[in-house]
Structures are given as structure tokens and as C-alpha cells.
Amino acid sequence: MTSERMTPELAQRLSLAEQHDWFRRATSRRALLRGGLVGAGTLAAGPALLGGTASASTTASATASASASASTSASSGPALLPASDIPSGSSVVPFGRHIAYGADPTTQMAVSWQVPTAVKNPFIRVGTSPWDLGERIEAEVRALTTLRTDVVSIDNVDPSASSTIEQYYLHATLKNLKPGETYYYSVGHNGFDRPKPSFATSVKSFTTAPHGREPFTFTAFGDQGVTYDAVATENLVAAQQPAFHLVAGDICYAEASGSGLITDPYDPRIWDAYFAQIAPVAAEIPWQVGVGNHEMEAWYSPDGYGGQFSRFAFPTPNTTYFAFSYGNVAFISLDGNDVCYEMPANRGFTADAQTAWLEKQLAGVRTAGIDFVVVYFHYCAYSTCVNNGSEGGVREQWVPLFDKYGVDLVISGHNHIYERTDPIRSGAATSAAPIGATVDPATQGTTYVVAGGAGENLHKFSAADSYEGGVDNISGISSYINSAGGTKVDETVSWSRVRYTGYCILRIDSKPASRGGTSTLTVRGLKEDGGEIDRIVLTRRAG
């Protein structure tokens, strides 16, 4: 694809922000769209909920793809379609529900969904009983417009005769909830209101994080896509009954090449399919997404994330990196595009602000009650996969901080395989950690896991697989590091302990101990049929 005849060669020479500026200048010359493109709407706070206040987020974050002049104000509400063009609400069925924690998982939950066309007065109902969901709480509309001329249909189906593709994302961030409480909810709009559990597909539930130190399970993967195998890994996630799920980037592959170029193949309708695919799981299990290279979409905003800020309710609004805590574990999600040499479209876009924020988080994270620190992001600090190797930008900017502050576990994707390292410090393995080993991160270093086998086409290793039931220990594996200027620096490594070419997820169980005892974090790799391919136990003295 070329956008207004931008050549691929020109796109490769421009940063993502420069491409977006070029695109905005080009499209501003077009006569477009019902008097201007829709940006995003805002909301008012909802009524009191169970002794607190449940309110919807008021951040307007969707960016129109050609003109920001038509974004709506708080006083006027979302400007969607003329009333005469809005179909009957009863015929418009919400789909693609997914939830995520707010800034405080003990008291906040964001509920997001989609409608196929504009609706009037979208809302959520929430209560502690499926039979009593309470009053309506107004939801925020974030409308996203994509020019038909900027779409290369990935499945070769003409999206429509219209000049644009319109997508309507709805969000409500519930606040002042009670810790450790199960809530029930339904979503709707004028003409569509199904608040009773007799509508089995309409009423869903979620549970806020508890106060204190209780055992819990979470899951993780990266590089999912919209495939049969992606459905299988989602079902495997659901079978673990996790408190929440981490996604290490490359979510649905609507942006097909992942280069962050405005000439890349792109079909936003893939997002519709993705949200419909994950809804049976993500409507009740918080889906904590990080971004990868396939989330850089140059059409909506200078940083490429306008589309993501429309689709997802990030814990920190309009920011692709964030932190949260659950029980005795602190979690940090990073945007690897900011430091990446391999896919440089967004390299340096935060001007080192993210790395400074990371150090501040790590310096203060081990407060009373936090035993383990888990960091997740897309690119691999350490991997021997031949497709993408290791990312030098991560090693240069973030790994020294992981060493300095004693990060326990790092989870990545990007390479579509499973791989686990021995514990690493200062770029080298400190000791062997075979399957079933116990690792003390305080003395041995950080364990790195690549869990990128969530559903997209699988990648390959140069060495043989080695996993539970098929161990093949090999030393001296040839690999490479992506470095400055698109170069690849060869290296021979001994830290690759477990390698598995197949679809998989991570299951991680936290078992806190009383103060002075030994807390454990059991890390297990599970293949698509649920069988175990890897297991180690990380230990820390409980604070």
C-alpha cells in the first residue's frame, strides 16, 4: 500500500511521527466525511455504587485519521451520526467485551466493548448480585475513522463501498469498588438493556484484587492474532482460572508487517474479529495488554497509538507503559518500541522519559508486602530464535536496571516460540537452571522467558528444542543481537535452557509466605493441549 502515493522507500526514512504528519497534510486536502471526522467523546460520573462512586473515564483519546477539528466537547457529548442515521438500538448488539484493571486493581476496573454502528446513550450496569445490577452508568464513546484508501484488505475482501470504515469503542472505568469483591455487569444503550442473568450472554462478572497477601495465579503470552490456535490458547488461559492475563504485545496483526510504516498493509476490521474472539475469556478475566511492533498504526496519531487508545482503557490514560500490583507481586509493562533497533519507527519517541520512569518505579517498588517484581514487554532481551533474535536496545537501556534493582522475572514475545534462560546477571548466566530448578533471584539474577507462541505462525530455533520430556542440553548456541543501524551482531550463548517450537502460554502461581518466610513464584510453560513443557520456582524472603 502507498498512502497518497508515499513510497515505501520514503516511509522507511521517516519516523512514525514524521509519517503521520505527512499523512495529515496529505489527507487535509481531501473533501472528507460528513463535515469532519469524529474524535472522541467524554462522560459524566455515574451514581454511587456500593458505598463508593462508580464513574466512567473522561479521557478523550481517539484521534481522527484526517482531521482533529471535529472532536467533541464535554458539553456537547460524542458527535457520532445524525439522529436520522442511527438505527434502532434494539437491533445493535454490543460485542467484544474485555476488561482491565484501573490504576488500583483493588478498587478499579475498566470495562470496554464495541458496537457495530453509532448508538445513543451507551451505559453499563454493575452490582454485587446478577439479579440486581443497579442504575445505568454512562459510558464513553471513542469513535475511530479509517479512510478506505488507507486499507489493504488482508483477507482480500472489499471492506465496503463507503469511503471510510467507522468503529465505535465504548469504555467505562469503575472506581471505588471493594477489594476482593465479585461484581456482575451488563452493557447496553438506548433500546438495548438486558440487565437480568436470564440473558446468559449479557451478564458477566469480575473480581477486584484483594487487599493483603493471598495466593493467586496469572497467565501470560504474546503474539496472538486471530487464528484457530489463538482460540486454543485463550481457552487454555481460561482453564487456568487466572486472576488476570498479561499480553506481551502483537495483539491482533491488523497492521500486517509490523514495521510502523504508513505504507504497511493494514485492515482495521481485524480488530473487530479479535475482540469478538477474546470476549468469551476477556469479558471476565482482566486483559492487561502491552504494545508490540504490530500496534504501531501511523494513521491515527504521531506516536502511532491513537488506535490503541481508542480500543483499550490503559491504566495510565494515553500512555503505553504502566505499573500495577496484585498481592505480593509488582508488575511493570513497558513499550519496547521506544528502545528498539530492529523496528525503529518509534525508537526514542519518549525522549528517555519511559526509561527514567522505569528506574523510578524499580527504585521504589519493593515496599512492604511486595516480594517479586515482574516486567513484561514485547521485544526479547535474550532469545536464540532465528527470526528476530535478541534486541540490543533492551539490553543496553533496560537490562542494567533489571540487574541493579533485582527484577525477578521478565516476560516477552516477538519470537513466536517458547524459550527460558538460566538466571542472568551482567549479560551472563550465573548458574544452570534445569526444568524443575529452584532459583533465588536475589543471588542468581533475573530469569527471562519468551512466550510468543499464542497463535500466530511459529518461528524457529537454530538449535534443537529442549523441554520437559524432550531435554537436549546444548552449549554454545549461535545467535545474534539486533543493533544500531539495522545491523546484527553475532553471539554464541550458553544461557538458553528451555526451547519449544509450538503454541503455548505461561501459568505463574504466587504463594506468599508470612514475614521472614520464603515466598514462591512457580513459573510453568504449558503447550496448547495443557501439557507442561517447563517449570521453575523463584524464591524470595517475604518482606
Predicted regions span which residues?
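N-terminal twin-arginine translocation
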Residues: 21, 25-34, 42-76
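N-terminal secretory signal peptides
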Residues: 1-27, 43-45
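Divalent metal-dependent phosphoesterase catalytic cores across multiple superfamilies
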Residues: 77-291, 295-320, 351-353, 359-363, ...
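Residue-level detector of secondary-structure transition/capping positions
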Residues: 40-41, 191
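Histidine-centered active-site/metal-ligand motif
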Residues: 170, 293-294, 378, 414-416
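Short, locally clustered residues in the helix-turn-helix/winged-helix DNA-binding domain
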Residues: 37
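Metal-dependent phosphoesterase/phosphodiesterase active-site architecture
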Residues: 14-19, 72-123, 128-134, 138-142, ...
